Amino acid sequence: MSLRRGVLTLLVALFPLMGARPTPAAVETTFPCSESMREGVEFWKNVWTRWTLEQVVLHDTDHPSIVYEVFELPPPAGEVYTDGQREYVKGRREALQARLSAIELKATGATPLSDDEKALALKITEVAGSAGITGASQRVRSQRGLRERFRRGIEISGRYHDAFVAVFREAGLPEDLADLPHVESSFQVAARSSAGAVGVWQFTRGAARKFMLMTPGLDERLDPIAAARGAARYLKTAYDALGSWPLAITSYNHGIEGMRVARDRFGLDFPKILDEYDGRTFGFASKNFYKEFLAAREIASDPAAYFPEGLVPDSPLTHDRVRINRPTAVHGLASRYSVPLPGLAAINPAWTARALRGSAPLPAGAEIWLPQGTLERVANLGKKTKAQPKAQAVDAPRADTMRP
């Protein structure tokens, strides 16, 4: 694209300081937490702030406060299990399931329990009553501790939080939605799920096409700010369709249509949906998604209380940005702004390999991040032509290096 035809709208990103969070009462009204959900919220707070990557928890899926065991994982404690660790966890889980099956069998036949069995049964009955013994062996789940990962996510969020808040504020949505990446990705730009979801906001390719730019040259899922706008569009659509934030947030995991079916059966009674909705794919992940969001929001609102050893938040960095009005080659942008292409690519992670090879342009409407001061430098060098209108200062969400 020739920059001599006035095809760029130039914007200097001026970012607001971190604002105060809403009061707890305001949050409670928007994001209610029933007494029945509190058990799950506290469980996820423990997963993220108490139990480490070296620990594995065996718990009841329906009653997560029933924690049977917390055991140490054989080293090394990496990001994912080794084959040996996976087998070790499986063995511990199956051994517990066998013990629970024996307890259920004895309870059915009125056979006395051993002291160890009585202690194990008591863990269940204190929370779920005697009826909880039935099927307990089928409700055992293993959960690895994620304290280190969540802690690092809190630190990384310093890079993006204010920008995300500004996006949701501009969209007229609750600002607390900016904490959703704690659940989805721990704020990791390069996060990829087994389902093909990508980026901080974890969009699949199909969903992303509806809410952001997806072309051979650009994948906005990998630009945290652009993806936040896509998330805002999605969540507004979900809220308008479903009528409550618990339903809309859960749809981020389960889909709008899936939650519409649940709402049509049970109305807006979200706790009842969690207890009684038996949709085929409405499993543990979907049932816990909103509780995880509530837990993440509580931790993020007062991180020092959960990480007393201290945190070192990433510094929010400012950048200039431009929005292109027609398809543009990235090499042309690098030349125009006298910024080495590798440097531009580092702060524009949404650019695809094809764009960097020059075989696919960036689409019209794409926003390009430039090193802070680039527009001022270009202006001072006298590079103001009819093709490059004067930069307009506006308020815009903050961005930073956006490195993985």
Residue ranges and their predicted role:
Residues 1-10:
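Bacterial N-terminal signal peptides that target proteins for export
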Residues 9-18:
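Bacterial N-terminal signal peptides
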Residues 21-171:
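An acidic, Gly/Ser/Thr/Pro-rich helix-cap/linker signature
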Residues 115, 132-159, 163-166, 170-171, ...:
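Extracytoplasmic and endomembrane cell-envelope/extracellular-matrix remodeling and assembly machinery
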Residues 174-181, 198, 245-250:
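Alpha-helical scaffolds flanking conserved acidic
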Residues 191-211:
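Short, surface-exposed glycine/acidic/tryptophan-bearing loops
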